């Protein structure tokens, strides 16, 4: 079962494939970054920036027509940063209900209008 809450859901399209016809790993990573940004923005109650991606693991390929669902879970909230565990699962015709395809740890920092780090108030981090 997916770990965390559903952050985004999108359909893998032909334009997102690599030369072998599978979905390009960079596209999947960008979907995870978008999903993590959604969750981190909610936690920070404002603008955030990705500062690190660790342990990116591609378990299975993603195919055209798969519905890609990205789930996020809070691992740690610091003074200005948030560490999130993100997992991508697909819904695929004629397959088990969900298949985990990718996971990684993303770190985001809360930033102000000038792009400088700003505090994340831990007492308001209930998402």
Task: Give residue ranges: language-model regions.
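Hot-dog-fold acyl-thioester-processing enzymes
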Residues: 1-52, 109-127
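HotDog/MaoC-like acyl-thioester-processing domains
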Residues: 2-8, 63-64, 75-127
